[in-house]
Amino acid sequence: TAFGIVGDNNKPFNLLSSSLTQNATNDDNVTIKLMHGVTDAPAVDIYANDTLVFKNISYGKYSDYINVETNNYTIDVKAHGDDNTVASFDAPLNSYGGRSGIVVASGFLTPTEQDSTFTLILATPNGETLQLAPVKTDLSIQDKKSIIVSDIYSISNYPNPFNPVTSINYS
C-alpha cells in the first residue's frame, strides 16, 4: 500500500506490504483489516454500527484482520479515545459474504483545494475497489454570531444618474 506525501519530510511517501487473506472464514462473514493512510489524522478508533471494531490504529499502520457479519454498516471514525465522530461512511457489505478485503483510510481530514478529502476504500484480493460513501448529515451552525454593519457607503451612479442599479458596500 502506498501512503504519505511526496517531498514531505514529516510524512514522506512510502510503500508498506502486508499479508493478504484471500477469503473469509465462512460465507456469513467478511474478513477485513484497516490501513491508516490519512497523514493529518491522529490514531483512530473505528466503529461499525456503534460497535468498536478497530482500536488505536495509527498513521502508516495496518490493523489485524477481523471477521464481521455480512451486513450493511455505518462506519464511524473517531480519534482514539475521543467520543466525537470525525467522519461516517456507508459500508454496504451485505454482498461480500465469504470474501476479504483491506479498508484503506486515505486523503486528508483538512484538505486544501488540490488535496483529496478523507475517504475509506475497500480493496479486495481480486482487485475490486469500493469507495465507501460518506454519510450525509444535517448541517448545523456551531458559532451563531450576529453580523453588525458599522459603515454603509453609497457609490455614485455617475455618469448615468438613471442607472437602475445601486451598490452598497459595507464592512
Whereabouts are the PLM-identified features?
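Intrinsically disordered, low-complexity polar regions and short flexible loop motifs
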Residues: 1-138
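Glycine-centered coil/turn sites that cap beta-strands in beta-rich domains
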Residues: 140-158, 162-171
